[in-house]
Amino acid sequence: MILKRTSLSRRKVLRGAGATLALPLLEAMQIKSFSKTNAYVKPPVRAGFFYIPNGVVQTAWHPKDTGEGYKLSPTLEPIKPIKNDVTLLTKLDRIKVAGTDGHAQAGACWLSSASPDELSPAGYPLKKTIDQIMAEHTGKVTAFRSLELSCNPYEDNRESVYFDNISWYGHGHVARSLRDPKALFNRLFGVKQHIESGSVLDLVMDDAKSLNHSLGSTDKGKLDEYMHSVRTVEQQIERVTKRQEDINRLKISSPVKPWQAMTRDEFIQVMGDLMILAFRTDLTRVATIMSSPERWGSPLKVHGLFDKPVDHHGMTHGQGNQHVRSKLESLDHFHIQQFTSLVMKMKNIKEGEGTLLDNMMFTLGSGISDGSLHIYTDLPTLIAGGAGGAIKPGRHIKSEKGTPIANLWLSMINAMGVKIDQLGDSTGKLKLS
């Protein structure tokens, strides 16, 4: 029996005067054949990396047990609603190379494919990072090879590029992070500056209505939900821009930029929302997002936690004080809350026969385990998602002491379809499924 269905290209976009809106994966895009078997195209695997600087308070991070039934530690308590979707990995190390700043090396080399003896002219064990190895493979079929995002509003250049970037094309070639949400939105959706005051949805509405007439009921619902999510992000950016304009009316000597008027939780969520939009529309399959830079005295203001800017790095060196350590634990807890919020959004997006999260590897981690001691052993690492079946989540995997984190990176690279057997100082692959 031949079924008559509308078939759409995965690259179908909505167009308007001055804007282009990519679409999420619809059922009409998945139909591989119109036979009675109704074979569908499998959604692609995506990889996202969520960086937290300056390590974590070790005593509050580590659970005492392993496996599927492990009990969450105080810091990890926010992942409770997504525990079955997250893999906790412990005892993964990087070898620290002497001669460079501990924080700069932690951030810049976190995802590095270099072994400890492969040093750049600047003295860092730094080569192409694993996100860029993945992007070389996946970027051939997406609009953007990769996205590099930062939630750092600070623009003081006292610190070098190594503190504020985790993605590198190779020695001396940084993939610089975007930190302006509005500029990122316009880049993703092709919004021209002279008409960016309106909604991108208004610009493509005629094309959207035309498409809607040809869709089935399920796809109509998906399209409506997606358009709503795009508008929600637009409104977030509009609110922050309005707040910036109000502040600038006070005639402060240095005008405030939109992202500098955000609390850090707002910043992380709006950048994370844009990353998720890029993933679900297949504009990219690889992205990195830094919650803050390494070491910088970046003003960190968190709604309901820190009403005045605090110095995260400075606090890590005061952990001997119980009051300071308590604040640090609250900050670690905050980062896990932000991660969980983004993961929940991915889990709520239907894709194929599952969800976007089922096809994700969303990794939270830091290149330094203890910010006060500057050590790289037992790095904090979480992975949300199932990577299209390559990962069996819901477990605490405790590796043998001295296991290089490169073993994890190698397994993740393979899950993205890149066939290599060695990466940096890897000694094998981690079994994640």
Which residue ranges define each predicted feature?
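Ligand-binding pockets and gating/stacking loops
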Residues: 1-433
